Amino acid sequence: SDISAVEDAYHFKRPIYAGNAIVDVHAPEGSRLVATVRVASWKAVGDAGNATIESRSANAAASSHTRFVKLESGGGERPDLQTAASVISGGRALASKENFELIYDLADLIGAGAGASRAAVDAGYCPNDMQVGQTGKIISPDLYIAFGISGAIQHITGIKDAGTIVAVNKDADAPIFEVADIGLAADLFN
């Protein structure tokens, strides 16, 4: 799982140790494989392909004990966190669910996805599906802006493939400044 490179049909690479090392995975030739890939490792293909599409029919009887009720969208117009070109994230320094609205407002203003550190999720400032990092979502936006996120290694693992990282944190020694392309040591509320 979490494949970041395909060397050949039975040889893959995947990150381990919070993304600090890459392991070679070899499967026995001729075996059937099921694999998951790390979304952030590949760029989207685009719409200009010329692959042929073959239509096939399947003779499968519909189940008698299940039925389709309806299809609903997840709602909201904010881009999906894992496919957004820009992501605005907040950390524990926002100090409340009400203050976290600033993250949503800025994300909506620029058409970005909204994310959070594990500390912000654990504190109840935002829902779990916004968590970015090793135990959340691995993302690779062109622009990642972090407000009040210290930069624990687990969070950095989730953003290491971002194009440009901007960090705002009042602690000038916060680890996030080590990976940020642009850093501002300031209080978000001033």
Give residue spans per PLM region:
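N-terminal glycine-rich FAD/FM-binding segment characteristic of electron-transfer flavoproteins
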Residues: 1-190
